[in-house]
C-alpha cells in the first residue's frame, strides 16, 4: 500500500511540475510578445539554415526584416517583399518581375514576419527546455509541441534572450528530419523611418513586369 501511495505522489508531483513549467513557458513567450509589440518598429538581420542530413541538404541564407505593426519589408532569397497593410508586393530583380497579391495568397512565399509574435498562441503545448549561454547571452529555450496529430513538424524550439526579452533563435524540427533554424542578429528598435518606407513605388521599376 505504501509503495502504491508513494508512486501516486510521485506521479502527481510530476504532473504539477510539468503544468507549472508549461505555464512559465507560456508566460515568458507572452512577455516577449508584449515587449516587441511595445516598439514602434523593429529591424533585424537574420541567418536562415535549412538542414536535412538524410537528404544531404544544407542551405544557408541571410536576410533582413523591418516590421512596424502589420507592415513589413523583407529582403530574403534575392527578393524583396513589401506589405503596406493592403497589398503584398514581391520584387524579384533577377527576373525584373513584381507580383502583387493579398497576404493570404502570398503566404507560401516564405515567412510572415508579423507571425513571429503570435503563432505560438494556438495549436501547441509548451515545455520549459534547456538554458544556454550563447555569445555572452543567457538564452532560455521554450519547446512547442503541436497538438494536431497530422502536424508536419515534431517541435519548435524558441530561444529567448532573457535579459532583453527578445527572440534570439527559432529551430523547427520536421517529421521528415529537416531542421530549419532562424537566428536573429543585430536587432534595432524604434528606428526613424520615412512615411513611405513600406509603400511600393512603381516609378523605381520602370522596366519590370507587374503581375497582379
Where are these regions (language model features)?
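N-terminal secretory signal peptides that target proteins for export/translocation
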Residues: 1-2
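Gly/Pro-enriched, hydrophobic low-complexity segments
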Residues: 127-131, 135-210
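Sec-dependent N-terminal signal peptides
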Residues: 5-14
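An acidic-aromatic
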Residues: 62-110, 180-181
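A generic structural motif
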Residues: 47-53, 75, 91, 145-147, ...
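Flexible, surface-exposed loop/linker segments and immediately adjacent secondary-structure boundaries
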Residues: 103-135
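N-terminal leader/targeting segments and the immediate start of mature chains
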Residues: 16-57, 70-71, 204, 209-212
Amino acid at each position: 500500500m505504501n509503495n502504491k501511495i508513494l508512486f501516486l505522489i510521485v506521479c502527481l508531483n510530476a504532473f504539477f511540475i510539468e503544468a507549472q513549467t508549461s505555464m512559465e513557458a507560456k508566460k515568458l513567450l507572452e512577455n516577449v510578445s508584449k515587449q516587441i509589440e511595445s516598439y514602434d518598429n523593429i529591424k533585424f538581420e537574420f541567418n536562415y539554415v535549412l538542414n536535412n542530413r538524410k537528404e544531404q541538404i544544407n542551405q544557408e541564407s541571410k536576410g533582413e526584416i523591418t516590421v512596424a505593426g502589420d507592415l513589413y519589408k523583407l529582403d530574403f532569397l534575392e527578393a524583396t517583399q513589401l506589405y503596406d497593410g493592403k497589398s503584398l508586393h514581391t520584387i524579384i530583380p533577377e527576373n525584373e518581375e513584381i507580383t502583387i497579391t493579398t497576404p493570404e495568397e502570398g503566404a507560401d512565399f516564405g515567412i510572415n514576419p508579423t507571425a513571429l509574435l503570435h503563432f505560438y498562441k494556438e495549436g501547441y503545448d509548451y515545455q520549459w527546455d534547456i538554458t544556454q549561454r550563447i555569445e555572452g547571452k543567457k538564452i532560455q529555450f521554450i519547446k512547442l509541441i503541436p497538438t494536431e496529430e497530422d502536424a508536419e513538424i515534431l517541435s519548435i524550439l524558441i530561444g529567448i534572450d532573457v535579459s532583453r526579452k527578445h527572440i534570439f533563435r527559432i529551430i523547427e524540427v520536421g517529421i521528415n528530419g529537416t531542421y530549419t533554424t532562424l537566428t536573429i542578429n543585430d536587432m534595432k528598435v524604434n528606428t526613424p523611418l520615412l512615411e513611405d518606407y513600406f509603400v511600393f513605388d512603381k516609378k523605381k521599376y520602370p522596366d519590370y513586369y507587374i503581375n497582379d
